[in-house]
UniProtKB/Swiss-Prot annotation:
Annotated protein name in UniProt: Floral homeotic protein PMADS 1
InterPro entries with a match to the protein in the record: MADS-box/MEF2_TF, MEF2-like_N, TF_Kbox, TF_MADSbox, TF_MADSbox_sf
SMART domains in the cross-refs: MADS
Any one cellular-component term (Gene Ontology): nucleus
Residue span, MADS-box domain: 3-58
Gene3D superfamilies: Transcription factor, MADS-box
GO molecular function: DNA-binding transcription factor activity; protein dimerization activity; RNA polymerase II transcription regulatory region sequence-specific DNA binding
Alphabetical UniProt keywords: Activator, Developmental protein, DNA-binding, Nucleus, Transcription, Transcription regulation
Length: 231
């Protein structure tokens, strides 16, 4: 039974369209390769799918550029001439802009002023004044930032100094390190410069304590007995 003729029109289903594209592309590349091998032909195929993906085939004996050059030579046309002329025009405009910018820079530096008339000189002065204003504002902003940074450093140093003073005053409040406890207690008196320390014991009055201890009378109802401690 003969196959029905396929109607040539756009395939609406995207999946079917991609499948058909892949099959026919492979078939086309196969035919191009057969032409290259059987007939020693130079074949180039460039294909771009509906999704924007590029596929190409080129005979192994030639490059794409060589094939385009051969096409231009055979047909007698220059495919790159219009593109080259556009590039030349763009280059000319860029060079003109560069010359004008260099001239403006020289004029702002006080050079190349002989060709300027009165109005142009007035405009140049106004531009320079505006530039100086912006520079001056930026300078003051930088100075302000530096002052704020310096103030923060000063505040930090002052805070450290206050903390050191508080620590120093706390140490000066009890130079001997006498620590009392409620009721009967013992304490250690520490002398500076690594001197001997004395253990002080506050005891209830006791008239039968040995005489070889040192007694300190506080004037109250209890005595302080001290013992020398070795380091």
């Amino acid at each position: 039974m003969a196959r029905g003729k396929i109607q040539i029109k756009r395939i609406e289903n995207q999946t079917n369209r991609q499948v058909t594209y892949s099959k026919r592309r492979n078939g086309l590349f196969k035919k191009a390769n057969e032409l290259t091998v059987l007939c020693d032909a130079k074949v180039s195929i460039i294909m771009i799918s509906s999704t924007g993906k590029l596929h190409e085939f080129i005979s192994p004996s030639i490059t794409t550029k060589q094939l385009f050059d051969l096409y231009q030579k055979t047909v007698g046309v220059d495919l790159w001439n219009s593109h080259y002329e556009k590039m030349q025009e763009q280059l000319r405009k860029l060079k003109e802009v560069n010359r004008n910018l260099r001239k403006e820079i020289r004029q702002r530096m006080g050079e190349s002023l002989n060709d300027l008339n009165y109005e142009q000189l007035e405009e140049l002065m106004e531009n320079v004044d505006n530039s100086l204003k912006l520079i001056r504002e930026r300078k003051y902003k930088v100075i302000g930032n530096q002052i704020e940074t310096f103030k923060k450093k000063v505040r930090n140093v002052e805070e450290i100094h206050r903390n050191l003073l508080l620590e120093f005053d706390a140490r000066q409040e009890d130079p001997y390190g006498l620590v009392e406890q409620e009721g009967d207690y013992n304490s250690v008196l520490g002398f500076p410069n690594g001197g001997h320390r004395i253990l002080a014991l506050r005891l209830q009055p006791n008239h039968h304590q040995p005489n070889h201890h040192h007694h300190l009378h506080s004037g109250g109802g209890s005595d302080i007995t001290t013992f020398a401690l070795l380091e």
